[in-house]
Amino acid sequence: MTTDNRKLTRTVAALRGRRIGVAGDFMLDRYIWGTASRLSPEAPVPVVDFMNESQVLGGAGNVAANLAALGATVLPFGVVGEDEPGGAIRECLAAAGMASKGLVADASRITTVKTRIVARQQQIVRVDRERREPLSKNLEESLIRRIKTALGQLDAVVISDYDKGVVTDALAERVLTECHRRGVPVLVKPKTSRLFAYRGSTAIVCNAKEAGFFVTRQLDDDESVGQAGRALLAHFGCSSVVITRGADGLSVFEDTVTDAFHVAATSREVSLDRIGQTRTDHASHGRQVFDVTGAGDTVLSVLALAIAARTPIREAAVLANAAAGVVVGKLGTSTITPVELLAAVRDL
């Protein structure tokens, strides 16, 4: 084991016990598992023979689940409907050791559910059940109060915005302002509909496609990635920007450092964002890729924990990339444990 590996191993141990608040769009990911060996006579689609079904936390809930699996104390903040899926989210939180008192119930809102039908390790179709209108002012105020009340006991806050209406401009701005006042770091997974609400964040974490939307251009070469990273730093006035790039790893841009830092993944079984990068590299051994669902949430979770533990962003990025390499080897929305993360670090 190298000196760097030993250092990362110590960092993994330091992640446990951190207190992280997660605010955003909590969803339920449902899976229908089956087999498919024939086509329907009614339409050119496969017939899936049902085997079983399962459900896990999705969206901001997947961030919370990853944090909890890594040993953090997690305080979730969001809105769910007064319906069966909303109850299922509370049950999933409880099963993972998280309280749901930070969730606000809205009788007029349906809980977001994403149902995936999977056969032979292949997703056949996804059905989304959701509403995207912004929260009412009363609900918004209730959620903000709950977050502000808890800030004194948090080491970091994650805002996970999937553009389902829970994260409003007012909520983002007021939470960021209060976090700044208290010295609590804030990591944000932003949406393009809120270009100004996240100014002053500690770190912005997005994928290459989202970064391209922000700078209104396609990121198709090394130069465009660098320009996007610098533009996002300037626009959001944040300390760092992390752009995830699927099988090509991730890139880190810092407000105090001129050169970008790239953590390269050697796996090429799947590619979300095929963008070349030749900057400072740290390799992550290639792994078999089954499903990229939620890999970005895992990156966000590990970054948040590492920053809460006062880990430098570059070291945090190496850990986050290693974690993503583990979860893409699992089918469905997945989490990572400290044991799995330690094993991945030792393989670097």
Where are these regions (language model features)?
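Positively charged, low-complexity intrinsically disordered leader regions
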Residues: 1-37, 345
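Substrate-binding N-lobe of the ribokinase-like
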Residues: 2-12, 41, 45-113, 343-344
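A short, aliphatic-rich alpha-helical micro-motif
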Residues: 15, 151-152, 195-199
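Active-site metal-binding loops of divalent metal-dependent hydrolases
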Residues: 26, 162, 298
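Conserved phosphate-binding/catalytic loop of the ribokinase/pfkB sugar-kinase fold
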Residues: 103-109, 116-151
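Short acidic, glycine-rich surface-loop motifs adjacent to enzyme active sites
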Residues: 153-166
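Conserved phosphate/ATP/ADP-binding segment of small-molecule kinases
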Residues: 165-282
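Conserved post-catalytic alpha-helical subdomain immediately downstream of the catalytic base
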Residues: 235-239, 269-344
